Amino acid sequence: MDNKKIVLLIIFSTSLLFLWDAWIKEQEKFNNPPAITQADSSAGSTQSRNDDSLPVPGSELTSSQASPDTNGIPASGGNGDSVTPRLLPSGEQIRVVTDKVIAEIDTIGGDLRRLELLQQPSSEDKDTPYALLYSEAARTYIAQSGLVGEGLPNHKTTFRAESDIRNYELSSGEDKIVIRLLAPEAQGVQVIKTYTFHRDSYVIDVGFEVENKGDATVRPFAYFQMLRDGNPPPAKTMMIPTFLGAAVYTEEGKYQKIPFSDLDKNKADYPANANNGWIAMLEHYFLTAWLPQQQTPREFFAKRQSDNLYSAGVIVPAGVIAPGEIAATTMPFYAGPEEQDNLEGLAPGLDLTVDYGWLTVIAKPLFRLLSFYHSWTDNWGVAIILLTMTVKLLFFPLSAAGYRSMAKLRLVTPKLKRIQDQYKGDRQRMHQAMMEFYKEEKINPMGGCFPILVQIPVFIALYWTILAAVELRYAPLALWIDDLSSPDPFYMLPLLMGISMFVQTKLNPTPTDPLQAKIMQIMPVAFSAIFFFFPAGLVLYSLVNNILSIAQQWKITKMYGTAPSKDTPEPPVSKQVNSSENPETTANSPADSPKQPQTPANNPRKMYKRTRKK
């Protein structure tokens, strides 16, 4: 049992080292992306387009074939360093403040150039709102939209605000704010671009009103895209890097991620044409997504615009507009945190953007239960404690069986040591004798390992739950723990967890191998050091789980009494395992020794009964 347990601990520790190595490599990749030649304009669309398919924005719209300077974004230098974008051309700024966001709209292109989330603190300063969209000297992440067609306005057109107001604020009694931007009339077509901000919502409706004042029918298409660089957002160090890139969802293809690296290599694979689904840009905790109405034709696209600059979006028909008629099209745009309850109600599959890794089947129910406890306590730390107690209760029968097995092993450890000493020159015979002894005493040597194996997936799933849940971002417990999603700043929880592990080792059977005994003594220190980098919420779970395990194990160990002293007479050992043994080597074997009287002192089964009666 000791050997198996050591192997499990070593495997787990090695896995953590591999994860750390992967994290280092990922950070190096982010810091030093390779220089890549200009991508083909068709990058991202993996399905051939029919003649009647929706048009894709050409170079006059997305500058996919033009010089990068067309969009105001220079190509990277020859050293392969990350691109440092120039500021995009700027016109007048329109500022909108609601109860959820602060937004800035630029009249050039009518782009949404900045969006701050009032209820989400910045990673650098808790008193500053988190900026999800921005157009700065070193970073670019904006939302663009326009119409496809000759003379129609796109994201390079200079719009004019219909109102003279440049600062809007949602006042009490108002449910929404509407911004109207007028494009210059061209070829008898008048276009008005609209933004509608809603109370208590991260959804912004972006629309176009097209009036045909000419003599010919027009058939415009509207495109909506997100443009961003490939730099990860500022965040505290995490053990495992989270996904940064695009994602698309359709009923046929389901949820698919589109890494920026695939766009760099022109190898992105996703469904381009559908009548359902959405497309998004993802980063840790937050996302932006265009959400077309169901059962309307659409074409998704994702492409590399230039070095370290990517776009993802959707194209939809804007109607068939006869002379003298007006048509309107609207596209909901979600820009906010990955709050699972809200995402589920916005669009099918949008909640899948919350990445739980390969243990989603376990992590998702864990978060549901965690949210349920939070609704009671209004404290995510207390909710984690209650979740730990629930998981411990579910595994109580398995844990009890394992601790009973370890208690029995603790009682017979001196006798096992005698068997090992007697057969130390023959490992095969020693193993056979020990297995026979386990069988006679009805002890399962692996009984203590199985509960550990079962709980490891739960531990990993909870790690991903804490890592992915924006609800735990800056969620406090008490005292110095003000962010359960980040490491303990004073390392108190990891130290307490290490102490609890040390206490657990004292309750376990002492390994007969001196090397194993030393390893077991080092393990609490090693794991404490590893947990310095883990989120405080996960360390809290481990600490509470260890405390509950210590209480359970101590109770069961007490039921079985203490281990016998080294002076306890030898137990009867198994029969002779090889009848052809040399008599000289087996003369003093336990099989030929006089039979000892069966007293409680040397009969473990009777001793168990005696301790139970006590």
Swiss-Prot record:
Segments passing through the bilayer: 6-26, 380-400, 450-470, 484-504, 524-544
Domain of life: Bacteria
Keyword set, alphabetical order: Cell inner membrane, Cell membrane, Chaperone, Membrane, Protein transport, Transmembrane, Transmembrane helix, Transport
Compartmental location: Cell inner membrane
Keyword DNA damage: no
GO molecular function, one term: membrane insertase activity
Membrane topology designation: Multi-pass membrane protein
Region Disordered, annotated ranges: 34-87, 562-614
InterPro entries on file: Membr_insert_YidC, Membr_insert_YidC_N, YidC/ALB3/OXA1/COX18, YidC/Oxa/ALB_C, YidC_ALB_C, YidC_periplasmic_sf
Ranges of Polar residues composition bias in the record: 34-48, 60-70, 575-602
GO biological process: protein insertion into membrane; protein transport
Record-level GO cellular component terms: plasma membrane
Subunit record text: Interacts with the Sec translocase complex via SecD. Specifically interacts with transmembrane segments of nascent integral membrane proteins during membrane integration.
Biological role: Required for the insertion and/or proper folding and/or complex formation of integral membrane proteins into the membrane. Involved in integration of membrane proteins that insert both dependently and independently of the Sec translocase complex, as well as at least some lipoproteins. Aids folding of multispanning membrane proteins.
Similarity annotation: Belongs to the OXA1/ALB3/YidC family. Type 1 subfamily.
Protein name per Swiss-Prot or TrEMBL: Membrane protein insertase YidC
Organism, scientific name: Nitrosomonas europaea (strain ATCC 19718 / CIP 103999 / KCTC 2705 / NBRC 14298)
Gene that specifies this protein: yidC
